[in-house]
Amino acid sequence: METDQPKTVDENTENKPQENKGLVENSLPSEPSPTLEKAEAQQENKAATKGADDADKRSGVVTKPQKKPPVSDPEAVKIQAWWRGTLVRRTLLHAALRVWIIQAWWRVKLARLQDSRRRAALENFTRKEWAAVRLQSWVRMWRIRRRYCRLLDAARIIQAYWRCHSCTSRGFIKGYYRVTANQLHLELEILLGSGPCIVTECIPLPIKQ
Protein backbone atom coordinates (compact mmCIF):
# COMPACT_ATOMS: atom_id res chain seq x y z
CA MET A 1 0.00 0.00 0.00
CA GLU A 2 2.75 2.42 0.88
CA THR A 3 4.65 1.77 -2.31
CA ASP A 4 1.61 2.35 -4.48
CA GLN A 5 0.71 5.75 -2.95
CA PRO A 6 3.75 7.81 -4.16
CA LYS A 7 3.23 6.50 -7.65
CA THR A 8 -0.28 7.85 -7.74
CA VAL A 9 0.98 11.23 -6.46
CA ASP A 10 3.66 11.40 -9.15
CA GLU A 11 1.18 10.50 -11.77
CA ASN A 12 -1.16 13.19 -10.61
CA THR A 13 1.64 15.75 -10.65
CA GLU A 14 2.68 14.76 -14.10
CA ASN A 15 -0.83 15.09 -15.38
CA LYS A 16 -1.17 18.73 -14.14
CA PRO A 17 -1.81 21.22 -16.89
CA GLN A 18 0.78 23.67 -18.10
CA GLU A 19 -1.48 26.57 -17.21
CA ASN A 20 -0.71 26.07 -13.57
CA LYS A 21 3.01 26.51 -14.34
CA GLY A 22 2.38 29.82 -16.02
CA LEU A 23 0.38 31.06 -13.10
CA VAL A 24 3.12 30.06 -10.68
CA GLU A 25 5.75 31.84 -12.75
CA ASN A 26 3.69 34.99 -12.92
CA SER A 27 3.08 34.91 -9.19
CA LEU A 28 6.87 34.66 -8.31
CA PRO A 29 8.81 37.99 -7.87
CA SER A 30 11.29 39.06 -10.62
CA GLU A 31 15.07 38.58 -9.91
CA PRO A 32 17.07 41.83 -9.31
CA SER A 33 19.76 42.96 -11.83
CA PRO A 34 23.53 42.53 -10.93
CA THR A 35 24.29 46.30 -11.17
CA LEU A 36 21.63 47.08 -8.62
CA GLU A 37 23.02 44.40 -6.34
CA LYS A 38 26.55 45.85 -6.60
CA ALA A 39 25.37 49.39 -5.89
CA GLU A 40 23.41 48.22 -2.88
CA ALA A 41 26.41 46.22 -1.61
CA GLN A 42 28.71 49.28 -1.98
CA GLN A 43 26.28 51.50 -0.12
CA GLU A 44 26.01 48.94 2.64
CA ASN A 45 29.83 48.68 2.88
CA LYS A 46 30.18 52.47 3.02
CA ALA A 47 27.55 52.72 5.69
CA ALA A 48 29.21 49.95 7.68
CA THR A 49 32.67 51.57 7.43
CA LYS A 50 31.29 54.99 8.39
CA GLY A 51 29.53 53.49 11.35
CA ALA A 52 32.67 51.69 12.44
CA ASP A 53 34.77 54.87 12.05
CA ASP A 54 32.28 56.90 14.04
CA ALA A 55 32.21 54.27 16.73
CA ASP A 56 36.04 54.19 16.88
CA LYS A 57 36.24 57.97 17.07
CA ARG A 58 33.69 58.09 19.83
CA SER A 59 35.32 55.33 21.79
CA GLY A 60 38.84 56.73 21.16
CA VAL A 61 40.18 53.41 19.95
CA VAL A 62 42.55 53.59 16.97
CA THR A 63 42.13 50.72 14.59
CA LYS A 64 45.32 49.15 13.47
CA PRO A 65 45.89 48.87 9.71
CA GLN A 66 45.30 45.42 8.46
CA LYS A 67 48.38 43.62 7.35
CA LYS A 68 48.59 42.74 3.72
CA PRO A 69 48.69 39.07 2.99
CA PRO A 70 52.15 37.83 2.09
CA VAL A 71 52.92 37.73 -1.60
CA SER A 72 53.67 34.28 -2.79
CA ASP A 73 55.52 35.40 -5.96
CA PRO A 74 59.32 35.52 -5.26
CA GLU A 75 60.03 37.67 -8.33
CA ALA A 76 57.67 40.36 -7.12
CA VAL A 77 59.28 40.19 -3.68
CA LYS A 78 62.73 40.65 -5.24
CA ILE A 79 61.58 43.62 -7.34
CA GLN A 80 59.95 45.25 -4.31
CA ALA A 81 63.07 44.69 -2.20
CA TRP A 82 65.29 46.14 -4.95
CA TRP A 83 63.04 49.17 -5.33
CA ARG A 84 62.96 49.77 -1.56
CA GLY A 85 66.75 49.46 -1.42
CA THR A 86 67.06 51.90 -4.34
CA LEU A 87 64.83 54.41 -2.55
CA VAL A 88 66.77 54.03 0.70
CA ARG A 89 70.10 54.45 -1.08
CA ARG A 90 68.78 57.47 -2.94
CA THR A 91 67.60 59.13 0.26
CA LEU A 92 70.91 58.35 1.95
CA LEU A 93 72.79 59.77 -1.04
CA HIS A 94 70.72 62.97 -0.96
CA ALA A 95 71.26 63.29 2.79
CA ALA A 96 75.02 62.72 2.39
CA LEU A 97 75.17 65.31 -0.40
CA ARG A 98 73.32 67.84 1.74
CA VAL A 99 75.66 67.15 4.66
CA TRP A 100 78.68 67.48 2.37
CA ILE A 101 77.42 70.81 1.00
CA ILE A 102 76.81 72.14 4.53
CA GLN A 103 80.25 70.97 5.68
CA ALA A 104 81.95 72.57 2.64
CA TRP A 105 80.11 75.85 3.24
CA TRP A 106 81.05 75.79 6.92
CA ARG A 107 84.70 75.05 6.10
CA VAL A 108 84.80 78.02 3.70
CA LYS A 109 83.09 80.23 6.27
CA LEU A 110 85.48 79.10 9.02
CA ALA A 111 88.52 79.64 6.77
CA ARG A 112 87.35 83.17 5.91
CA LEU A 113 86.70 83.90 9.59
CA GLN A 114 90.15 82.64 10.56
CA ASP A 115 91.72 84.66 7.74
CA SER A 116 89.96 87.82 8.87
CA ARG A 117 91.03 87.20 12.48
CA ARG A 118 94.61 86.53 11.40
CA ARG A 119 94.62 89.69 9.28
CA ALA A 120 93.23 91.76 12.15
CA ALA A 121 95.85 90.34 14.54
CA LEU A 122 98.61 91.04 11.99
CA GLU A 123 97.41 94.61 11.47
CA ASN A 124 97.28 95.16 15.24
CA PHE A 125 100.80 93.73 15.61
CA THR A 126 102.13 95.92 12.78
CA ARG A 127 100.54 99.00 14.35
CA LYS A 128 102.14 98.24 17.71
CA GLU A 129 105.47 97.43 16.06
CA TRP A 130 105.40 100.62 14.01
CA ALA A 131 104.51 102.67 17.12
CA ALA A 132 107.43 101.09 19.03
CA VAL A 133 109.79 101.75 16.11
CA ARG A 134 108.71 105.38 15.90
CA LEU A 135 109.18 105.85 19.65
CA GLN A 136 112.62 104.26 19.45
CA SER A 137 113.56 106.44 16.48
CA TRP A 138 112.40 109.56 18.32
CA VAL A 139 114.42 108.60 21.40
CA ARG A 140 117.52 107.90 19.29
CA MET A 141 117.06 111.17 17.41
CA TRP A 142 116.69 113.11 20.66
CA ARG A 143 119.86 111.49 22.12
CA ILE A 144 121.88 112.10 18.94
CA ARG A 145 120.65 115.66 18.70
CA ARG A 146 121.52 116.33 22.34
CA ARG A 147 125.00 114.88 21.79
CA TYR A 148 125.42 116.93 18.62
CA CYS A 149 124.38 120.09 20.47
CA ARG A 150 126.90 119.35 23.20
CA LEU A 151 129.68 118.81 20.67
CA LEU A 152 128.67 121.96 18.83
CA ASP A 153 128.77 123.99 22.03
CA ALA A 154 132.19 122.52 22.88
CA ALA A 155 133.48 123.33 19.38
CA ARG A 156 132.18 126.88 19.65
CA ILE A 157 133.89 127.31 23.02
CA ILE A 158 137.17 125.93 21.66
CA GLN A 159 136.94 128.17 18.59
CA ALA A 160 136.25 131.20 20.76
CA TYR A 161 139.29 130.48 22.95
CA TRP A 162 141.46 129.84 19.90
CA ARG A 163 140.37 133.03 18.21
CA CYS A 164 141.11 134.99 21.35
CA HIS A 165 144.55 133.40 21.58
CA SER A 166 145.31 133.99 17.91
CA CYS A 167 144.22 137.60 18.16
CA THR A 168 146.67 138.23 21.00
CA SER A 169 149.55 136.53 19.18
CA ARG A 170 148.86 137.87 15.70
CA GLY A 171 151.67 139.86 13.92
CA PHE A 172 152.29 141.80 10.68
CA ILE A 173 155.07 141.50 8.13
CA LYS A 174 156.10 144.41 5.96
CA GLY A 175 159.26 145.21 4.00
CA TYR A 176 160.74 146.38 0.78
CA TYR A 177 163.51 145.29 -1.58
CA ARG A 178 165.91 147.02 -3.99
CA VAL A 179 167.76 145.48 -6.87
CA THR A 180 171.13 146.85 -8.05
CA ALA A 181 173.49 145.61 -10.75
CA ASN A 182 174.77 142.60 -8.82
CA GLN A 183 172.91 142.63 -5.46
CA LEU A 184 169.39 142.28 -4.03
CA HIS A 185 168.82 144.45 -0.99
CA LEU A 186 165.93 143.06 1.17
CA GLU A 187 164.62 144.61 4.36
CA LEU A 188 161.72 143.01 6.34
CA GLU A 189 159.96 144.29 9.46
CA ILE A 190 157.96 141.68 11.44
CA LEU A 191 155.58 142.95 14.11
CA LEU A 192 154.68 140.24 16.67
CA GLY A 193 152.98 140.40 20.02
CA SER A 194 156.28 140.42 21.87
CA GLY A 195 157.83 143.26 19.77
CA PRO A 196 159.03 144.32 16.27
CA CYS A 197 161.79 142.45 14.47
CA ILE A 198 163.72 143.94 11.54
CA VAL A 199 165.63 141.74 9.11
CA THR A 200 167.96 143.23 6.48
CA GLU A 201 169.99 141.21 4.00
CA CYS A 202 171.93 141.70 0.79
CA ILE A 203 171.81 138.81 -1.66
CA PRO A 204 174.45 138.85 -4.45
CA LEU A 205 173.13 138.01 -7.89
CA PRO A 206 175.22 135.81 -10.23
CA ILE A 207 176.26 137.61 -13.39
CA LYS A 208 177.08 135.74 -16.58
CA GLN A 209 180.12 136.90 -18.50
From Swiss-Prot:
Alphabetical keyword list: Cytoplasmic vesicle, Repeat
Gene3D superfamilies listed in its UniProt record:
1.20.5.190
One Pfam family linked to the record: IQ
**GO CC annotations?**
acrosomal vesicle
Specify where the region named Disordered lies, as residue ranges. 1-73
Q: Where is the composition biased (Basic and acidic residues)?
A: 1-19
Domain IQ residue range list: 72-101, 128-157
Q: Enumerate the subcellular locations listed in this protein's record, separating them with semicolons.
A: Cytoplasmic vesicle, Secretory vesicle, Acrosome
One annotated GO biological process: positive regulation of acrosome reaction
Q: Which residues form a coiled coil?
A: none
Q: Does the keyword Repeat apply?
A: yes
GO molecular function list: calmodulin binding
State where it is primarily located. cytoplasm
Query: How is the quaternary structure described?
Result: Interacts with calmodulin.
Q: Summarize the protein's role.
A: Involved in sperm capacitation and acrosome reaction.
Q: What is this protein called?
A: IQ domain-containing protein F1
Q: Which gene is transcribed and translated to give this protein?
A: IQCF1
